[in-house]
């Protein structure tokens, strides 16, 4: 059975999501985040990375409707293509822990979690690991205004 490699991300202490192995390009352990006035609660900050200002999305805040409580904040930098053949673009996600790599097989596919709601807006698929569903994030949708 074919397998793929994914990064499992802790969005907060309870929420997990995943991205493809090649989508995460950098992890910033103690990010300097700059506040953006009058921005939505799930995207209140930006991260300067490689001389580029990236939105720092808090997907846990978007899903739960309030900012996530984290013991530590990390920022993952992710690459995505807005459309096929386009140059890669980058965005940041706020994380609650260091991502872990995992192997995923087709027979692990499952339905998206029912709670919190709105996973269908963020995710393109889902797999089960240790009896927990882990949604696979749709990064182009997330970073190109799909959450507005």
Residue ranges and their predicted role:
Residues 1-148:
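An acidic, low-aromatic, low-complexity terminal/linker signal
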């Amino acid at each position: 059975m074919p397998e793929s490699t994914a990064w499992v991300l802790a969005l907060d202490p309870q929420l997990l999501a995943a991205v493809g192995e090649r989508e995460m390009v950098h992890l910033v352990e103690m990010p300097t985040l700059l506040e953006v006035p009058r921005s939505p609660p799930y995207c209140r900050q930006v991260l300067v990375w490689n001389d580029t200002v990236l939105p720092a999305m808090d997907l846990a805040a978007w899903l739960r409707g309030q900012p996530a409580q984290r013991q530590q904040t990390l920022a993952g930098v992710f690459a995505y293509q807005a459309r096929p053949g386009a140059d890669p673009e980058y965005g940041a996600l706020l994380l609650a822990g260091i991502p872990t790599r995992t192997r995923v097989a087709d027979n692990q596919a499952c339905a998206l979690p029912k709670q919190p709601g709105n996973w269908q807006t963020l995710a393109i698929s889902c797999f089960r690991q240790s009896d927990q569903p882990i949604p696979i994030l749709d990064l182009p949708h997330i970073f190109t205004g799909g959450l507005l």
